[in-house]
């Protein structure tokens, strides 16, 4: 199975990488269509920034941001995912045409999410989560990050299945950058096989994360800004593809699509 590319469509004023760039419906739809042209398999539409320290919009504002975009992109033939922690937003997004729910809290932020996903019978991305963005970095402490993340995701999957979600719906995400220090992110990236061994599809979302902006820098140097982390992101796309993951979630689709073509060419030659 080829690794899928999920292109990010942030309809937010404050996302860490591109906040405000696609904040109107028209701009977000145009950006999504451009990502499809670049080779995206899925478009992940979100109306809430999950960068460390971000404030949450109210539900009505989140709906106002994402539903028109999802509706238009779905009408254009795109396979759309909704990036939300709110069950009510997920339900309306599915009605508008979304065919995947991507919840960075894995259903922990809203107790109604499991029921919505079970009723909708759509794929559900379950991320490793230790709290909302304003406090999550306070919980970036692990004895063995790989073991603990795998255990937490396995337990989360079991709980969701007990609440009516079909096991076949679940996709696991280790949550790069969420309650993780750089060393935790590198360790997870080096041990994707452990996540794969859980028996679920895996989504990798390293795109433009801060740990990629520190590679090769001397102590005290400022990390490279998000827009200068796409080469590093493409490198992690190669690592993820070689590990056999289900998908990668990226901002710059073209570079990751090219990286996957290189992987495919090497595998075909072997």
Where are these regions (language model features)?
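Extreme N-terminal starter segment of soluble prokaryotic enzymes
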Residues: 1-5
